[in-house]
Regions:
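Cell-wall glycan-active module
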Residues: 1-192, 197, 222-251, 309-404
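Substrate-binding clefts and substrate-entry loops adjacent to catalytic sites
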Residues: 168-172, 233, 240, 254, ...
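Active-site metal-coordination segments of metallo-dependent hydrolases
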Residues: 178, 202, 300-306
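Short, solvent-exposed secondary-structure capping/transition elements
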Residues: 197-199, 211-216, 324
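Structural recognition of the beta-strand scaffold that forms the well-ordered cores
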Residues: 198-204, 266-269
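Short secondary-structure boundary/capping segments
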Residues: 205, 216-220, 257
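Solvent-exposed loop/turn segments at secondary-structure junctions
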Residues: 205-210, 272-278, 336-339, 381-387
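Catalytic cores of eukaryotic secretory-pathway lumenal/extracellular enzymes that build
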Residues: 211-217, 222, 293-296
Length: 404
């Protein structure tokens, strides 16, 4: 009996091997051959052909990352603080009904908390999963690779309004005018020749329900933090940088008063970084009034309109025009076109391209525009694994691959 069991296992293994060989040697379809000629590895072509069959007008172009290996990029992206996963119990969409979003599988072991304590370092497996383009070649998530040039056919005001849904800007007016944020974003996008749908998605990601940076109340927040003794405890995560060490900056804030810092806006959260809430918000204020902002980007940003228009121009110049012309490339800045600013990533939130892609594809779908000729630029790394990187949550997370 034992010998039979061994033989059965051997036969099963042999059949599996034969099946794998047959699959590997299967002939490619004409469209798959076209993709391979363009430069896509065979590990991409099945998923891309499936998308092509559903949307024949879609165009897929490879971005060859030939001067860096997959491992070299992964090592760099695993640097402390580069890729963070939210620490939250909030669950969007269908995950709200389940009662969880399951972010935990993406945390690094003994993960360090960042910023206000609401973010954890991503594990190496999580970085590999989010960095691997093959993880997201489906009808919804593929929009992280959409090019961000202006296209009046798809980027209508209705789509922009749908993209803003769930944020404080949805169907809302700005600066005590009767004009809506969607009107403003469309106007700015057309003027800059950059997708207003992309701009709307980025504004939603950065502001959501509305932060002090979007409401012109940065000073109130700074004064509150500066005068709260409990928040000034050494190593408290609401503090950061020099403010945590000597308090000199906080004394100046208290002496000046909140109104000195109120009335300034930073909708794209440009420069809003640091190791605590105080430092993050102070740096957001500093960007809004900086010499460069005033000289090149319509500053100081004393109105919501100025902050949206000026911030959008800076995003376009630094990112869209700087070799980062997809949502993916603004997180994983691997394009050779980026030159000396190759590693200049827009955000630390590892899931930002995925979140923006989903809100974008949803808006296009609801507007009946999914069959337009979108162009997707998808990175291909040198020496990347033969199979897609696995999802640390094994399909059971809001960050797992998702169709529309």
């Amino acid at each position: 009996m034992k010998g039979r069991a061994v033989r059965r296992c051997a036969w099963a293994a042999a059949l599996t091997l034969v099946a794998l060989i047959v699959w590997a040697c299967r002939p490619l379809s004409p469209y798959q051959e076209e993709l391979v000629r363009k430069g896509f590895p065979e590990s991409y072509v099945d998923r891309l052909e499936d998308l092509h069959e559903r949307h024949p007008n879609w165009i897929f172009e490879p971005l060859a990352v030939t001067d860096l290996t997959w491992k070299a990029v992964l090592d760099k992206e695993c640097s402390p603080g580069w890729n963070l996963v939210v620490r939250s119990k909030w669950a969007p969409g269908v995950w709200k009904d389940k009662g969880y979003a399951n972010y935990k599988p993406y945390y690094a072991k003994n993960a360090k908390a960042y910023d206000s304590g609401a973010w954890y370092q991503a594990s190496r497996a999580a970085v590999a999963y989010f960095m691997d383009p093959r993880s997201f070649l489906n009808e919804s998530d593929v929009f992280m690779f959409e090019t961000l040039a202006f296209d009046a056919r798809a980027q209508t005001r209705a789509v922009v309004e749908r993209t803003l849904e769930g944020s404080f800007m949805h169907k809302a007016t700005y600066d005590d005018t009767k004009r809506t944020f969607s009107e403003l974003v469309c106007e700015v996008g057309q003027r800059l020749q950059v997708s207003p749908v992309f701009l709307a998605g980025r504004l939603k990601s950065e502001q959501g329900a509305g932060t002090v940076q979007a409401k012109g109340r940065i000073g109130d927040s700074l004064l509150s933090l500066a005068t709260n003794a409990a928040d000034r405890v050494k190593e408290n995560r609401v503090w950061g940088g020099a403010f945590a060490r000597d308090g000199a900056g906080t004394a100046a804030i208290v002496a000046a008063g909140a109104e000195v810092f109120n009335g300034y806006y930073n909708f794209f959260n440009i420069g809003a970084c640091g190791t605590g809430l105080f430092e993050i918000r102070f740096n957001a204020f500093r960007e809004a009034v900086s010499e460069e902002t005033c000289r090149r980007y319509g500053g100081p940003w004393t109105t919501q309109a100025k902050a949206v228009a000026g911030g959008a121009r800076k995003v376009k110049e630094l990112y869209v025009d700087g070799g980062r012309h997809t949502r993916y490339l603004q997180k994983f800045s691997v394009s050779p076109q980026a030159g000396s600013k190759r590693w200049l990533q827009y955000m630390q939130n590892i899931a930002a391209p995925l979140q923006e892609a989903r809100s974008t594809s949803k808006a296009y779908r609801e507007a009946g525009l999914l069959d337009l000729p979108f162009t997707f630029v998808i990175p291909v790394y040198r020496d990347m694994p033969s199979a897609p990187s696995s999802d640390p949550a094994d399909g059971d997370s809001v960050y797992s691959p998702s169709e529309l």
